[in-house]
A protein has these predicted regions:
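Chalcogenol-based redox active-site neighborhoods
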Residues: 1-152
Length: 152
């Protein structure tokens, strides 16, 4: 698992509009990079809408927000449009970045095991160094936890 003090891995991923976002694009401001299992599921939708509703506060804290899952560009586009999301959703269909940061793991759900993204959030500094990690995210408290961390 990528941890505090590590450089976030380099990447180039498409967003919901088909534009390529490079890890270099994140430099110059802090970034929240949150990994989530799947578009249009209840908890993932709540999480995305929480970021949407608080984006202005994160902007005031000079912090960008990026969501990443294994969904396709088309699914991201539909999800973003349906919920009026105001930040980039990045496509990691082959799970390469998810594997590099250690969030693509064996999960148990309803007694079944399968590989998938474990909900995890990273905060990066202006040089893409990891300065905060939230593992096993609690969606209800995540936004306030992130704001409090960024205000310190």
């Amino acid at each position: 698992m990528t941890k505090i003090g590590d450089k976030f891995p380099d990447f180039n991923l498409k967003n919901q509009n088909g534009e390529t976002i490079f890890s270099e694009d994140l430099k110059g401001s802090k970034s929240i990079v949150y990994f989530y299992p799947r578009d249009n599921t209840p908890t993932c939708t709540t999480e995305a809408c929480d970021f949407r509703d608080n984006l202005e506060d994160f902007n005031e804290l000079n912090t960008k927000v990026y969501g990443i899952s294994g969904d396709s560009e088309k699914k991201h586009s539909n999800f973003s449009n349906k919920h009026s999301l105001n930040f980039d959703l990045l496509v990691d269909e082959d799970y390469q970045l998810s594997e590099k940061v250690g969030v693509y793991q064996l999960k148990k759900s309803f007694g079944k095991e399968s590989m998938g993204i474990v909900r995890t959030t990273f905060v990066l500094d202006e040089d893409n160094k990891v300065i905060h990690v939230i593992e096993k995210v609690k969606v209800k408290t995540q936004i306030e936890d992130l704001k409090n961390f960024l205000k310190e």
